């Protein structure tokens, strides 16, 4: 009787009776009658949960990267694995409230955050919510809701890098110039000063404050982030900086999303025709977080246990840094990704991936750092592929031969260890190389203006500095800088030297400055 009732309900002829066909047609008919397809595509149910990753049934029409809500739990997640009978979802937050049977709802959109100018000077989490205890962010007329996953600017919208992005670090601005819209990797072992260079670049924008800075802390300790924020605030740099934080205690999905959130904030200002600088500190921890998520989702591991698409997660992030042309507002987004190496191995998987994506790298060496050469930049392994087009005429002229001189010094310094009987030319090259290295040293959190940088490089070639004892070089540099800042005309020239279009070292105010100081 029950079978007859089923057949009648779905209008199946008795002659076509077959147990399998009846059940199949019955399911289809009931699904259509009660519109269950729509319900099952929008809602799902947790099958099991483990280590922040859940398997969900239903959600048949969900897309990769789509945002989902755990109903009644005030928690969100993102779909990363689409399988035949289930969906793999990572949770953005604590998973203690999630259990088998919890209802999951599609949000039918990718993760998005609210972005506005009011974020300047604030510390926010991955979801764009303030965590600095200074109150909520209020919506204004300029507030935009932007997806954290956005397509990189196309070829037609871009313009070649041609404007300088000064870091305030002598060795970088002279030998590894960076332009607005460039992606320059900072790479090196742990505790070699990688973050210090990026932070100096942020502090250096205080001169004209026309660049908005975003610092993305991925997997950092809370105490480290707190010290950074306090230092930026003390130096007056926090007012044009936004700090996006995902600490080491946060779940892997939050650490994974942090760089994309920071990039979206930077794109907001870039699209407004402004200039932005973003620091990703660091993408090694970002890759580890993604590896953790992928292994929990049972994705097949590849080299160093990273999933096959680990290159893509970084390329799609870094390609969003660009210099836009006049039609699209002339804005720019400059990226400083940071990568940590193990024992100086730049041939590891993640370092080689990011080196191939970026427009150059600043390589910091542990050996140089331990010798007291700071910033510990290895000039031979470092390069800036597009920044030379943005370098000022003054710096280009003065620093032209500097890299060659340093290379010659490094080559001869190796032989100096084995032989003390060097000819006069070799002795001169070695002495000048040591002087140059001494003058290129710089204290952390003390960026220099382009004018003062150019002056110090000019001073390297003067007879006064050439004849100085190496132990006196740093103190003489400090005295010279104080002297320049005490004379209004010199200080004014140093401030506007970046705008000088043509430069002749023999006929310059620099010569007058140095001669005046020596007298």
Swiss-Prot record:
UniProt keyword Ion transport, yes or no: yes
CDD domains in the cross-refs: ATP-synt_F1_alpha_C, ATP-synt_F1_alpha_N, F1-ATPase_alpha_CD
Source superkingdom: Eukaryota
Disulfide bonding pattern of the chain: none
GO biological process terms held by the UniProt record: proton motive force-driven ATP synthesis; response to bacterium; response to copper ion
Site (Required for activity): residue numbering on this chain: 382
UniProt: ATP binding residues: 188-195
Places the protein is found: Mitochondrion; Mitochondrion inner membrane
One GO CC annotation: extracellular matrix
Any GO molecular function: ATP binding
InterPro entries, per database record: ATP_synth_asu-like_sf (IPR023366), ATP_synth_asu_C (IPR000793), ATP_synth_asu_C_sf (IPR038376), ATP_synth_F1_a_nt-bd_dom (IPR033732), ATP_synth_F1_asu (IPR005294), ATPase_a/bsu_AS (IPR020003), ATPase_F1/V1/A1_a/bsu_N (IPR004100), ATPase_F1/V1/A1_a/bsu_N_sf (IPR036121)
Principal cellular location given in the protein's record: mitochondrion
Keywords annotated in UniProt: ATP synthesis, ATP-binding, CF(1), Hydrogen ion transport, Ion transport, Membrane, Mitochondrion, Mitochondrion inner membrane, Nucleotide-binding, Transport
Function as written in the Swiss-Prot or TrEMBL entry: Mitochondrial membrane ATP synthase (F(1)F(0) ATP synthase or Complex V) produces ATP from ADP in the presence of a proton gradient across the membrane which is generated by electron transport complexes of the respiratory chain. F-type ATPases consist of two structural domains, F(1) - containing the extramembraneous catalytic core, and F(0) - containing the membrane proton channel, linked together by a central stalk and a peripheral stalk. During catalysis, ATP synthesis in the catalytic domain of F(1) is coupled via a rotary mechanism of the central stalk subunits to proton translocation.
Subunit structure as annotated in this protein's UniProt entry: F-type ATPases have 2 components, CF(1) - the catalytic core - and CF(0) - the membrane proton channel. CF(1) has five subunits: alpha(3), beta(3), gamma(1), delta(1), epsilon(1). CF(0) has three main subunits: a, b and c.
Family the UniProt entry places it in: Belongs to the ATPase alpha/beta chains family.
NCBIfam families for this protein: atpA (TIGR00962), PRK13343.1 (NF009884)
Name of the molecule in the record: ATP synthase subunit alpha, mitochondrial
Originating organism: Dictyostelium discoideum (Social amoeba)
């Amino acid at each position: 009787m029950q079978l007859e009732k089923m057949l009648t309900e779905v209008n199946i002829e008795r002659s076509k009776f077959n147990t399998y066909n009846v059940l199949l047609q019955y399911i289809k008919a009931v699904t259509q009658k009660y519109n269950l397809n729509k319900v099952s595509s929008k809602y799902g149910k947790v099958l099991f949960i483990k280590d922040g990753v859940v398997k969900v049934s239903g959600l048949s029409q969900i897309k990769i990267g789509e945002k989902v809500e755990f109903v009644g739990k005030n928690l969100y997640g993102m779909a990363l694995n689409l399988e035949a009978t289930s969906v793999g979802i990572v949770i953005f937050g604590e998973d203690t409230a999630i259990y088998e049977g919890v209802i999951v709802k599609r949000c039918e959109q990718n993760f998005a955050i609210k972005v506005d100018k009011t974020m300047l000077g604030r510390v926010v989490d991955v979801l764009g919510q303030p965590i600095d205890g200074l109150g909520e962010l209020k919506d204004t007329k300029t507030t935009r809701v932007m997806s954290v996953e956005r397509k990189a600017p196309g070829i037609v919208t871009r313009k070649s890098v041609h404007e300088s992005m000064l870091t305030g670090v002598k060795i970088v601005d002279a030998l590894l110039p960076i332009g607005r819209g460039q992606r320059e990797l900072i790479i090196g072992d742990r505790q070699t000063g990688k973050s210090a260079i990026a932070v100096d670049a942020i502090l250096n924008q205080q001169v004209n404050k026309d660049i908005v800075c975003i610092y993305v802390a991925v997997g950092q300790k809370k105490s480290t982030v707190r010290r950074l924020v306090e230092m930026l605030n003390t130096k007056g740099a926090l007012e044009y900086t936004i700090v996006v934080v995902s600490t080491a205690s946060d779940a892997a999905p939050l650490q994974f999303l942090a760089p994309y959130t920071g990039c979206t904030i930077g794109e907001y200002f870039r699209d407004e025709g402004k200039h932005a600088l973003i620091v990703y500190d660091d993408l090694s921890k970002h890759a580890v977080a993604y590896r953790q998520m992928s292994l929990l989702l049972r994705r097949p591991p590849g080299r160093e246990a990273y999933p096959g698409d680990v290159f893509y997660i970084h390329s799609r992030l870094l390609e969003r840094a660009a210099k836009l042309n006049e039609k699209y507002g002339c804005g720019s987004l400059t990226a400083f990704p940071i990568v940590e190496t193990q024992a100086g191995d730049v041939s590891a998987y993640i370092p080689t991936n990011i080196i191939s994506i970026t427009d150059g790298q600043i390589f910091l060496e542990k050996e140089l750092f331990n010798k007291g050469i700071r910033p510990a930049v290895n000039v031979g392994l470092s390069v800036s592929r597009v920044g030379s087009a943005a370098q000022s005429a003054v710096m280009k002229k003065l620093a032209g031969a500097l890299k060659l001189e340093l290379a010659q010094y490094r080559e001869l310094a190796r032989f100096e260890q084995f032989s003390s009987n060097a000819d006069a030319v070799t002795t001169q090259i070695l002495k000048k190389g040591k002087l140059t290295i001494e003058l290129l040293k710089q204290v952390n959190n003390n960026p220099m203006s382009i004018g003062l940088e150019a002056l110090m490089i000019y001073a390297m070639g003067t007879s006064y500095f050439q004849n100085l004892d190496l132990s006196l070089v740093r103190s003489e540099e400090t005295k010279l800088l104080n002297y320049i800042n005490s004379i209004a005309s010199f200080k004014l020239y140093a401030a506007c030297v970046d705008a000088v279009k043509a430069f002749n070292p023999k006929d310059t105010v620099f010569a007058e400055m140095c001669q005046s100081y020596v007298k």
